Amino acid sequence: VKFYEGDVRDEALLRKIFAENEIDAVIHFAGLKAVGESVAQPWRYYDNNLNSTLVLTKVMEEVGCKKIIFSSSATVYSGDNEMPLRETSKTGNCTNPYGWTKYMTEQILSGMAFADKEWSIVLLRYFNPIGAHISGRIGEDPRGIPNNLMPYITQVAIGRREFLSVYGNDYDTHDGTGVRDYIH
């Protein structure tokens, strides 16, 4: 497996990668993902998350690679939807810049597929993706304040934190706490 280190917004690098490899499809996971950080630095999120998609799809179009799987997010769903969410639930009306970048990227890709039927586009919308390599060299191990639930759980499990705090007591559940589904 070849490894290229770079920025997805680097058009020359992307052209080189496509020229040196036979690429049939792209799985687009590149992007910044911390909701709180996106509120503090919205320009950074719009620049990185949207421009990376625009540059990537421009180069893909040029080389004739028209299959992409995009790592979106459940943050694209509107807050006024009935639960549980469905794929057909209303999107937009996002509450933070991170969500808006995912929503806008979906709109860009959907527009491309509408304009050119040769494009095959898959949008994955999920909640709190996590994972790590068995070696521990890559994965969720934040040194600062975690950005989602799973790093808190792992920090409690390894003894870095004494306990896990659960916030909220007014959710529509039998005990008022939030319910999350996890898939392994």
Where are these regions (language model features)?
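Conserved Rossmann-like nucleotide-binding pocket used by diverse enzymes
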Residues: 4, 19, 46, 122, ...
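Receiver (REC) domain switch-region micro-motif
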Residues: 26, 68
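Conserved NAD(P)H cofactor-binding loop of Rossmann-fold oxidoreductase domains
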Residues: 30-33, 72-73
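Catalytic helix-loop patch of NAD(P)-dependent Rossmann-fold dehydrogenases
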Residues: 40-58, 62, 66-67, 76-128, ...
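NAD(P)-dependent short-chain dehydrogenase/reductase
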Residues: 110-184
